[in-house]
Amino acid sequence: MFTSRRRLFMFLWPVLLWHLPVRAQETTAVAPTGTQIRWVTLHQLERSLPREPIRVVFDVDDTALFSSPGFQWGTAQYGGHIVTAGVSVREEDLASPEDRRKFREFWTRMNNELDQYSVKKWIADELVRMHKARGDTIYFVTKRIFTGSEKLTETLRKTFELPELQPVIFTSRDSKTPAFRRVEAVLSYGDSDGDIRESIAAGVRPIRVLRSRTSVNHEPTNNGAFGEEVLVNSEF
């Protein structure tokens, strides 16, 4: 009997964890700016939303998908000066035509093939389910480089069961602010500082999703530094 109860507890614990109120030590955590982090649970977030349907935007890498396998392969195949999971490398930054060719080749493969190795984040699945139940319209906006073709949209449609999903908006390293304004977003989810800053610039409520500690994107994140709410247990 004890063994059966223990197994049941171990099975249910991850589910229960997502619905626990924010712990005291989390509410007193300090952002890099010295201010307290505004932690929010999934349940609290849902209760804070307006009753009528809204338009929401998800970032892709490290927010909706754990896509590090593709970027890790790309770095090994093409070199770290060409492939990065962050936003620092642009085609015009590369010195040689060969490096620029490799750059475009990687992004073509990333957007058409390598997401077969990406894994949806559990928190993203929970968020998408919540927004679908509310009747909200969901968009995905990414700073990935667009090279003329992509299967990312179809991957996201299948992964999150969104058959009516509009094509992913690729900004090719440019700011997401115009895209947020164009779709008239009310809420956005992102893991990077750029996601948060550009959401604020567009007048959109930003929610910080924690980046996995095993992500190959090592660009610093200053969670809570912009006054944004940070989603509890969103690393997974």
Where are these regions (language model features)?
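Bacterial N-terminal signal peptides
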Residues: 10-19
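Non-catalytic pre-domain segments flanking phosphatase-related domains
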Residues: 2, 22-60, 225-236
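Structural recognition of the beta-strand scaffold that forms the well-ordered cores
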Residues: 55-58, 65, 138-142, 167-169, ...
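Bacterial N-terminal signal peptides that target proteins for export
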Residues: 2-10
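Acidic, Mg2+-coordinating phosphoryl-transfer loop and its flanking beta/alpha structural elements
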Residues: 185-236
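Short, acidic loop-to-helix structural element flanking the phosphoryl-transfer center
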Residues: 84, 97-100, 104-139, 146-150
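Substrate-recognition "cap/lid" segment bordering the active-site pocket of phosphatases
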Residues: 145-197
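Active-site neighborhood of HAD-like aspartate-dependent phosphohydrolases
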Residues: 43-116
